[in-house]
A protein has these predicted regions:
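Charge-rich, well-structured scaffold segments of protease-associated domains
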Residues: 1-9, 22-23, 28, 39, ...
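Short loop/turn motifs at secondary-structure junctions and domain boundaries
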Residues: 16-19
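M16/MPP (pitrilysin/insulinase) zinc-metallopeptidase core fold and M16-derived inactive scaffolds
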Residues: 42, 47-114
């Protein structure tokens, strides 16, 4: 399956012109998805990112940490790709992929050579639209996330940021830790993660 095709863009304008041949443009796909592009004529590599306006603030009280789980689990397989297939697609071409969770957004991104952009678009789109959210992988990632939280708890800067948000925004979803807490991560179920995935509209 290939998603590489010409898609008509409704051109919306130039956002920034750096004067060095690098111009940021904003376009809109027919379904309403906003596309920002920046051409860098001297570069052969391409970075693509899907910024989703769903973050930890959107979690239900009983599903704190679901965004962080989702960030991990989207890389773990679709009906047409295993986790190994997803990783190998980028490794094979010397590319890389990753994701990051924030309070109000999540980003899934990849960097490849320009000739491999269609592959990167296809794989990232498959991950975002067809993830299996495998129960066994969820349990594996639960351990990984608990280790990440333990490492964060050993970093004074991370602890200070989390405590400041907690005190300043007491009771508000923005005051909660982005990654959840050990207690909430232990309690997150597959249903919480699938419910959170349903908030993402591609």
């Amino acid at each position: 399956m290939s998603v590489h095709r010409e898609i008509p863009l409704d051109f919306d304008g130039v956002l920034a012109d750096e004067g060095n041949g690098s111009v940021v443009r904003r376009s809109v796909l027919p379904g309403g998805v906003r596309v920002l592009t920046e051409a860098m004529p001297d570069q052969r590599s391409v970075t693509i990112g899907y910024w989703v306006a769903v973050g930890s603030r959107d979690e239900s009280p009983e599903g704190y940490g679901a965004t962080h789980f989702l960030e991990h689990l989207l890389f773990k397989g679709t009906p047409t790709r295993t986790a190994m297939d997803i990783a190998a697609a980028f490794d094979r071409v010397g590319g890389e992929s990753n994701a990051g969770t924030a309070k109000e957004s999540t980003v899934y991104h990849a960097r490849v050579l320009d000739e491999d952009l269609p592959m990167a678009v296809e794989v990232l789109t498959d991950m975002l639209t067809s993830s299996l959210i495998d129960p066994d992988e969820l349990e594996t990632e639960r351990g990984v996330i608990l280790e990440e939280l333990a490492m964060d708890a050993d970093d004074p800067v991370d602890v200070a940021h989390e405590k400041l948000a907690e005190v300043m925004l007491d009771g508000h979803p923005l005051g909660r830790p982005i990654g959840g807490t050990p207690e909430t991560i232990r309690a997150v179920t597959r249903d919480h993660v699938v419910g959170h995935l349903s908030l993402i509209h591609i």
